[in-house]
Every structure is written in C-alpha cells, then in structure tokens.
Amino acid sequence: MKKFIQDFKAFALKGNVVDMAVGVIIGGAFGKIVTSLVNDIMMPPISLLTGGVNFTDLKLVLSKAVVEGGEVVKPEVSWNYGNFIQTTVDFLILAFVIFLMIKAIMAAKRKEEEAPAAPAPTPPEIELLTEIRDLLKKQ
C-alpha cells in the first residue's frame, strides 16, 4: 500500500499532470466566458437580424403536451435543435480562439529558436594574448 501511495504521489506531482490539471481548470473557466460571449454578445444581434428568433427556443415538436385540468399529464416531446445550434456556435468560437492561442505560442517558440544566441564575450586573458600576438607579428 505504501508503494502504491508513493507511485501515485510521483504521478500526481509530475509537471505534466499538474500542467494538465491547471489547463483543465482554466479551460473550464474559459468555456464559460465563451458561452457568455456567444449567448450575451453575439446571439442577440443575430437574433435581431433573423427577426427576433431566439435560437435556444427553436425546436421540432414530435408530440404535444397533454394537459387535463390544468395539470400536464403527458409532457411535450420535442427535438431541440436550437440548443444544438447554440452549442455548435460556442464550440466553433472556442476552437477558433484556442487555435489562435496555439498559433501565437508556436510563433513565439519559432521566434525564440530563430534568434541567434549572442556570442559569449571574449575573456580578458584571450584579448591580451591576441594583442601580444598582433604586436609580435608587427615586429
């Protein structure tokens, strides 16, 4: 049991696992931001352009609800394709933003790799020896 706990600790504290956990947490929060962007910022103008259609309300009713005495006896059965449209827009925006972020990271890495390393400064001893050599050549 002790070995199992040690193995788990080694696994859980590896850099990649911790990085992945942080990524999942940030990704979840970022997903909420994108959902809000789509629902609250992008879809209202689209709804305005389409004559006030709210995409989340779009559905195809397969069987209507049965109401008797003000009480629903049989609930409505519907195919809610509007939610699918909304979720697809969310996904496309999220995928596009992640694509842009990865492109930016890759470009920064490429730039870092392409930048030549500055030459190391010549030690003073070498400079002195070079000067002595040059003076001896002149004589």
Curated annotation (Swiss-Prot):
Gene3D superfamilies: Large-conductance mechanosensitive channel, MscL, domain 1. Disulfide bonds: none annotated. GO terms for molecular function: mechanosensitive monoatomic ion channel activity. The keyword Transport applies. GO terms for cellular component: plasma membrane. It is found in: Cell inner membrane. Pfam families: MscL. It is a multi-pass membrane protein. The chain crosses the membrane at residues 17-37, 88-108. Keywords: Cell inner membrane, Cell membrane, Ion channel, Ion transport, Membrane, Transmembrane, Transmembrane helix, Transport. InterPro entries: Mechanosensitive_channel_CS, MS_channel, MSC/AndL, MscL_channel. The keyword Glycoprotein does not apply. It comes from the Bacteria. Belongs to the MscL family. Homopentamer. Channel that opens in response to stretch forces in the membrane lipid bilayer. May participate in the regulation of osmotic pressure changes within the cell. This is Large-conductance mechanosensitive channel. It comes from Porphyromonas gingivalis (strain ATCC BAA-308 / W83). The lineage of its organism: Bacteria, Pseudomonadati, Bacteroidota, Bacteroidia, Bacteroidales. The gene is mscL.
